[in-house]
């Protein structure tokens, strides 16, 4: 047998023989001599023979065609992942090799372009949220939320956090996971009054032991919480105010910082990040100058070199685990730099007016859909909303959604998964991409299936 090396394929037969000869072994099997023979797999793995690239691509495309996607179906599914317009320039820019990484650079002095891009992301987040400082991004909005709660515990030295059940249920799950590692932490969940937080119960729960109060804006059920009223409950208790906010909605709604929020977190998925099997996403974390030194994740700052030229650096690194290890503000130092860049490009391409216009379209399209459902005889739950709302059906939502797929429609989220109180309730998302005809068809088919 002729044994040859291959320029691009590692570990050829020739490579194996040379390695075995070097270490004095006769075969690869000899390397596993210490492993009992009865647990060794004494046969080849059941792996198919290689195929030509064209044949393989055809097979993979056939497999992929089984998926239901927003390219083949009209989507009214949201619940944290939305079908929004992404300018074409986003993919063109993030595909540049200089940017194509999920990490902040380890040698920042030679990565000025990447650092400036992250700095611009931080600046855009601060403008949207009306906050002083933002980090370079986090894994997703839910991670950012949990980290915000940890910061509140650390800052206030108190052990209770009061959270609305209007928060995304998975964000609450992440928080409870974090809390399990800290026995002294207490998480108090406040019930809803319809689709918004029960303010009387919230006010009663906030006391001198409260580290923070957290709500979502707009909340998981699509309704807009009264941040001004909620903040009034917190002021004299010396607790922090955490707001989990949809950044696109902030193009129109009054930002949380204007209501006295101490920490604003969320997910920038609505800006330039596609709905790709639920991820990856990009969490943002914004706060006040007072809390700057306790921010998790990495911070990029602007500075000057010895010659007076503008430059960018990773700043305040003493907070991070590679410096302080167990005393770090957070054990997260990785982030979503590539997705943060995508969101930055999308926001920059749209501009302030463009973001505002898209936010307005979301409200208008959602309100139109609401009215059509009401005209069709559905019960639509009350609440001022952005681009999501709740509709009650007479039949199980899973059954309705399975039938809607036959009409190339992806229905809304089954809220019965979250709570028995919302059995047969569908959370419907209507973004700027949904047309009048698509909405009308959805309502018509939903009505037929509900009869």
UniProtKB/Swiss-Prot annotation:
**Catalytic activity reported:** N(6)-[(R)-lipoyl]-L-lysyl-[glycine-cleavage complex H protein] + glycine + H(+) = N(6)-[(R)-S(8)-aminomethyldihydrolipoyl]-L-lysyl-[glycine-cleavage complex H protein] + CO2
Gene3D superfamilies the record matches? Aspartate Aminotransferase, domain 1, Type I PLP-dependent aspartate aminotransferase-like (Major domain)
- Enzyme Commission no: 1.4.4.2
Q: Which GO molecular function annotation, any one, does this entry have? A: glycine dehydrogenase (decarboxylating) activity
**Could you mention a single GO BP entry for this protein?**
glycine decarboxylation via glycine cleavage system
Signal peptide positions (record): none
Q: What are the TM regions of this chain, as residue ranges?
A: none
Q: Which domain of life is it from?
A: Bacteria
The answer to whether UniProt assigns keyword Zinc to this entry is: no
Q: Which UniProt keywords apply?
A: Oxidoreductase
Q: What does this protein do?
A: The glycine cleavage system catalyzes the degradation of glycine. The P protein binds the alpha-amino group of glycine through its pyridoxal phosphate cofactor; CO(2) is released and the remaining methylamine moiety is then transferred to the lipoamide cofactor of the H protein.
Q: How does it assemble?
A: The glycine cleavage system is composed of four proteins: P, T, L and H. In this organism, the P 'protein' is a heterodimer of two subunits.
| NCBIfam families tied to this protein | PRK00451.1
Q: Which family does it belong to?
A: Belongs to the GcvP family. N-terminal subunit subfamily.
The protein here is known as Probable glycine dehydrogenase (decarboxylating) subunit 1
Name the source organism: Staphylococcus aureus (strain MRSA252)
